[in-house]
Amino acid sequence: MKIDILTLFPEMFAPLEHSIVGKAKEKGLLDIHYHNFRDYAEKARHVDDEPYGGGQGMLLRAQPIFDTIEQIEAKKPRIILLDPAGKPFTQAYAEELALEEELIFICGHYEGYDERIKTLVTDEISLGDFVLTGGELAAMTMVDATVRLIPQVLGKESSHQDDSFSSGLLEYPQYTRPYDYRGMTVPDVLMSGHHERIRLWRLEESLRKTCLRRPDLLEHYNFSEEERKLLDKIKEALDQGED
């Protein structure tokens, strides 16, 4: 995969040289470039200007963004504008991006964008219902979430398939050694070696956690008959005040 990032602060992306994204680069699975669009700005390298009609703050000018993208060698890239008013970023969207060959991220700054910039983009995406100083942190988050889904980046395919949100549910609780730590013990079912019991326990705990913490995820979840029965059991227990 090839990723190009338009930003005023390329140095902010140093963390992407480490961990999973860094390893993807080392394996030759990822080619990532940072472009300071101030280098392409006319008018004394100014990238912002006052909005027509008045208003608070400054807007990112169209010219530096257009010129930067036009010099990037890409065949048919997915061009993503980081915008608080965009569509929410999700695990499903990250999985969609992981199938692409070329991605371009535009990191904004200031009060907003000249609307004409949006004629370049294929996607307007928001990290969440909050406002950041710029798009850099959002872009780093999206790149990390996407790159780890590229085949061969993680050691095992199942490493990300069991993640929270990949299945549509939150991930079940997990434990490692020792069995007893300060009086807190590992659930007996996980020590049983009984694969079917373990599978059912994990599914039930995943449903329970999702029901308690993110019930909104269940609204559009496609339940199997088994999952529906387990959820009904969980809700009945919760209604009765059981843990």
Swiss-Prot record:
Keyword hit for Transmembrane helix: no
EC numbers on record: 2.1.1.228
A single cellular component GO annotation: cytosol
Record-annotated disulphide pairs: none
Residues involved in S-adenosyl-L-methionine binding: 108, 127-132
A matching Pfam family: tRNA_m1G_MT
GO biological process: tRNA N1-guanine methylation
Keywords on record: Cytoplasm, Methyltransferase, S-adenosyl-L-methionine, Transferase, tRNA processing
Reaction catalyzed: guanosine(37) in tRNA + S-adenosyl-L-methionine = N(1)-methylguanosine(37) in tRNA + S-adenosyl-L-homocysteine + H(+)
InterPro entries given in the database record: Alpha/beta_knot_MTases, tRNA_m1G_MeTrfase_C_sf, tRNA_m1G_MeTrfase_TrmD, tRNA_m1G_MTases_N, tRNA_MeTrfase_TRMD/TRM10
SUPFAM superfamilies with a match to the protein in the record: alpha/beta knot
Major localization listed first in the record, in broad terms: cytoplasm
Molecular function (Gene Ontology), one example: tRNA (guanine(37)-N1)-methyltransferase activity
Family named by the database record: Belongs to the RNA methyltransferase TrmD family.
Xref: NCBIfam families: PRK00026.1 (NF000648), trmD (TIGR00088)
General function of this protein: Specifically methylates guanosine-37 in various tRNAs.
Subunit structure of this chain's protein: Homodimer.
Name this protein carries in UniProt: tRNA (guanine-N(1)-)-methyltransferase
Species name: Streptococcus pyogenes serotype M2 (strain MGAS10270)
